[in-house]
Amino acid sequence: MHCRSVRYASWSAAALLWLAAIPAPAQITVTELQTPYSFISSQSGKDYFISNVNGEPDQADNNGFITKLDANGKLVSLKFIEGGKSDVTLHAPKGMALVEQTLYVADLDTLRAFDAASGKPVATIAVSSGSAPSSVRLTDVAFDGKSILYCSDQKANRIYRVELPSQKVTVLVTDPVLAGPAGLAVHPKSGQVIAVSWDKGKILEITPEGAVTELFSNGFFSSRFTNLRGVDFDRWGNMYVSDFTTGKVWRMTWDKRFQVIAEYLPSPGDLGIDRTNNLILVPYEYAHAAEMNGLETPSGSRSKQEKRTLADYGFIPPPPKPPAEGAVKK
């Protein structure tokens, strides 16, 4: 289990409860993030990137920027990539994905590509569903590890497929059941696309052919999720999702157990998992901040620290308490 924890904070008091993290002796604070949306790492775990909308999420104001951190979580450049500077166009950067040394960024109706080492623009991919490109509003992008990027359009209930290196864009699926697809991830083992729903708090699986299956949804008597923003997986196949409105980060284990690993968070956004270093990366949009924390390493033995269960949140009835020793049964 990692003992490294790096916190970026611009708020004075935030109630944070990381149930699976270890307190760390070192902290680094950055107070100049502006509406951070997404937080990702390179595959090697040596570079980290945070997208900053810096204003209205749908406005073409060319003032968005990307923050870069080094392997130790220290600031390399607050505005490593900045809209309006050095021939860069970047309006409201949201979700990101790294393909080798190329950083792809969802920016309104365009997928922009930058060199991850220099920050220089290398490609611009216009995304259109056949209607006016300006109607497209991309929220996230995910890479399948081979040659395909997937992009979500939350407002249109649509997911796009982008082929590399040809940059051919097609609509993978448009379906109301997606209910505002915000965050995307590709399952590291199955290769299926996972989308989380902003409108109805659903988690969905989409095949490479575009077939949609609901994995988790709120029931009539229980509502686990409200407005889901981010999703990613650790190296063991556990899924992590952020609930923007309730301020919680959930873990769904491979055997479908639900665990709240953090709560009372200020607007947790499009989270990422650094699988190399076993870290969780969470941006806080309204707090203009972001945080890195170590994740618990799965173990065959039971942890000495009692973890919270679904019973604590009313999702399943708690097991009956055993009778006191020596009690007389009637």
Model-derived segments and their meaning:
Residues P268-P318:
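Blade-level signature of beta-propeller repeat domains, shared across WD40, Kelch, NHL, RCC1
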Residues D70-K74, D115-K120, E163-Q167, T207-A211, ...:
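Short loop/turn segments that connect beta-strands within beta-propeller blades
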Residues I50-N62, A289-G300:
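Short, conserved, GDST-rich strand-edge loop motifs in beta-rich repeat architectures
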Residues L33-G45, E56, D61, G84-Q101, ...:
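Beta-rich, blade/repeat-based domains predominating
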Residues T67, R112-A113, Y160, L204, ...:
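WD40 beta-propeller blade core
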Residues Q27-V30, L75-D87, K120-A132, K168-T174, ...:
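A short beta-strand motif characteristic of beta-propeller blades
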Residues N54-D58, T110, A156-N157, K200-K202, ...:
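Short glycine/acidic-enriched loop and turn motifs that connect beta-strands
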